[in-house]
Amino acid sequence: MEESPREAWAQFPAWSSSRKARTGPSLASVLNDLPSAATLRYRGPGVLPWGTLDENDDEGRSLQAFAETAQMESQPSRELPWPMQARRAHRKSQAREQVASGSESRAAYWTQQLSRTKGKMKEGFQTIQPWAWTLKKIGGQFGAGTESYFSLLRFLLFLNLGASVIEVCMKLIPTWLEGAPPGPPGPNISSPCGSYIPHTQGLVTFPTQLFNLLSGEGYLEWSPLFYGFYPPRSNLAITYLCSVFAIGLIYLLFILHRSVSGLKETLLAESDVLTSYSHRVFSAWNFGLCGDMHVRLRQRIILYELQVDLEEAAVRRRATEQTLGQRVKVWSMRALLNLLVLALLGAAFYGIYWATEYTVTLQETPVVQQTPLLKLLVNYLPSIFISVFNFVLPPAFTFIASLEGYTHSRQIVLILLRTVFLRLASLVFLLFSLWNQITCGGNMEAEECKACGYNYKEIPCWETRLGQEMYKLVLFDLLMGLLVTLLIQFPRKILCGLCPGALGRLSGTLEFQVPDEVLGLIYAQTVVWVGSFFCPLLPLINTAKFLILFWLKKITLFSIYSPASRTFRASTANFFFPLVLLVGLAISAVPVLYSIFLIPPSKLCGPFQGKLSIWAQIPESIESLPQTAQNFLYFLGTQAFTVPLLIVSSILMMYTVALANCYGRLISELKRQIETEVQNKVFLAQRAVALSSRNGVS
């Protein structure tokens, strides 16, 4: 026969004897003196009011009251402050009552089952994720910041893999399903917009072959790699254009999901109400770990997190102790350093603009035309300038941020902001220079652009030219990473290990610079977003590049780098990195949408030949649909649809804001209750010390 919760309580005489052996003030008087008693008299349903118990009350009656009270509560049995046997009896009693009364509805049952299934699927997905053990090992040895870099790299790798599948299904396959695409235009084909003759050489020398491979010219210029290869077919034009919006939407949704999940961790980590130290000490350990290696890795992760908290607390304490004169000195230093940062950025942008503007002029000189290596260098001149500035300025930004007196997490954010501005703005300046060449500086009445709407004399297929520039940026970024690793980092590590003296100290210890590495990923991904419309296979190339980069960085991390002397919060990485990715996605959308809606497509290449704009293909395709489908699609663009949609969206937004405000007030109330509970514990500890001292004296 099963025992009741009351009988289970009766098996623990220590709970009863402790009350009888207690001396001093009664429990009711102590509870009434608690700080929370002055503001929180009503404790909610199911909790006995304070002051109702007395020491002379019948013991069984009080235990029965507590048991009956707990049975009325809806909280799970594991949350009750009871012995284990009493909680088991209480859980069985609740189960019998639920079966007898049928209080658990079918909807609640399926909701519970769905939540359990979702949790199990999430755990299983995390278990089968590629390189999960590698990331865990990196986090344990080098900290959460370094782990976040590899996590972001894995995330971008799979996004590019998905985009590559969509590109192949919506561009390559439709091209070959409707027949073999035509060859390149011949020299006899001309139009009012000139002629376009891709240089598809046959047998060439090895230097020329290498030049074509690295520049995207020659046999690659008329290949599925670039926009100009795809023939002007209506079905292909629709799938080509729709793939751009489909891939962009997928990127946006996945990055937003990652940003929101990181925002929750950031808000919790940055909260000052809950002490980070107690959270790390009491709830950070995973009791399901098996094996010494897993235990040591978890210990290192907790150690790094505590180290970050202690470092930032020390910096904040020093900041609060500063005098007015010291604060003025600090702010003056920060102003001067920011002026220096602006000067460095201005010099970098001017160099990139100069390199892009004069590349065409230098390519036409006889010396460059006769020397293949010099021609390759001139062709890569904008990419070289961008890579040099991206290699030199981030360490300078790191040094400048260390002089500004911020916490390490704030320094990471500043370095990220400055570096992302450098990398993305340099790409913007490159695109602006190319736009200036394509559209004659925006002057459509100029002689070169008046006939066709673009500079057809210098750039007969401007989409392929843009794709080639993005292709060269992706390749050069990969080559720079390989060269820096093989020619700088490995020799530096060997020199540091073989020369323990002054020369070894001069070479220094290599530490993994997370901000610079992350911004390199975001810059590379932004280049791919810009160029994927003009170079459809660029996501596939970037997938292979990220795969090579993952293994290269993993090998160099464990063989060259040492754990960072200063770390930063994982919450900063989990939220800020996807946020910068969103900025890169927004920046990349501007040139792509501008090309689709405003610049006339090339007249001699690509699937949109002869159109006033690339977007003009959509209305023409709609007109070929049945009348019912046309009416429905045109209705989506009228005010009869957009105005109700705007009203419904506004109502949903207001509801979301109101719900967020309610949750905010609830969170504030819970925080106040936590503070009150802390005061209660302090008060009880003080009373216990006072009573112990009094009993010792007596």
From Swiss-Prot:
Pfam family, one: TMC
Record keywords: Ion channel, Ion transport, Membrane, Transmembrane, Transmembrane helix, Transport
Topology Cytoplasmic: residue spans: 176-235, 356-380, 433-469, 539, 600-639
Catalytic activity entry: chloride(in) = chloride(out)
GO molecular function: mechanosensitive monoatomic ion channel activity; voltage-gated chloride channel activity
Domain of life, source organism: Eukaryota
Cellular component terms (Gene Ontology): plasma membrane
InterPro entries: TMC (IPR038900), TMC_dom (IPR012496)
Cited function: Voltage-gated chloride channel involved in high-concentration salt taste sensation. Depolarization induced by high NaCl concentration may trigger the activation of TMC4-mediated chloride influx into taste bud cells, helping the return to resting potential. Also allows permeation of organic anions including gluconate, but their current amplitudes at positive potentials are less than that of chloride. Involved in pH and temperature-dependent modulation of salty taste.
Family label: Belongs to the TMC family.
Protein name, as recorded: Voltage-gated chloride channel TMC4
Protein source organism: Rattus norvegicus
